[in-house]
From Swiss-Prot:
It comes from the Bacteria. The keyword Transcription applies. Signal peptide: none annotated. This is Probable transcriptional regulatory protein SUN_1622. The lineage of its organism: Bacteria, Pseudomonadati, Campylobacterota, Epsilonproteobacteria, Campylobacterales. It is found in: Cytoplasm. GO terms for biological process: regulation of DNA-templated transcription. NCBIfam families: PRK12378.1, YebC/PmpR family DNA-binding transcriptional regulator.
Amino acid sequence: MGRAFEYRKAAKMKRWGTMSRVFPKLGKIITMAAKEGGLDPDMNPKLRTAILNAKAQNMPKDNIDAAIKRAAAKDAADIKEITYDVKAHYGVQMIVECATDNHTRTVANVKAILNRNGGEMLTSGSLNFMFTKKAVFVFDKTDDMDLEELELDLIDYGLEEIEEDVEPQENGNDKAIVRIYGEFTSFGELSKALEDKGIEVKKATIEYIANTPVELDEKQLEEIEALIDKLEDDEDVQNVFTNIN
């Protein structure tokens, strides 16, 4: 784990200081899901997942409720998801995932950030062969949880990989977690299987996983991280997936 864990830990520690930017982005996803599939989370799986992920980031209930209500407003923005393929220095490639009500504004902002920081926007779909979309679920590792047994139980629902990890906490006490991966088309089946087993999922996402990760030294990593920070500072950017190992 080593360096990879420390890198993730540093990134998470930094995010704790930027919740004022994170909550509006989470709210946008909740509003979009509610507008698409209805305001009732029990009848709208996408909204249910958006709320789950917002709670995982400690988004207050009042903020979540307000985001849902915005979807019912007559003047509710028509928010759409869009992704951009990006090339950066040192062989780094990125999928930049956005949620926006103004594509012209978003593409202009992303291009400006890339142009100022050595990045380049590629033709849409250029990196399809470099990444694979996966369903990813994260939940707490309990003392009585048998991962081998759980793996066997979930294979029929699309599970491809299961791993144990530790998640940094603000109080410094790292927490044992389990992360599972499956085909993105199995997202619903895996979600239902975990629910049926009484496992409380902390985070459920569709992620772009690099097929051939690249290694960077510390200086290169700092430079790319600075670019990622600038992209994530944009109000429309939801996620930045990279091929960094």
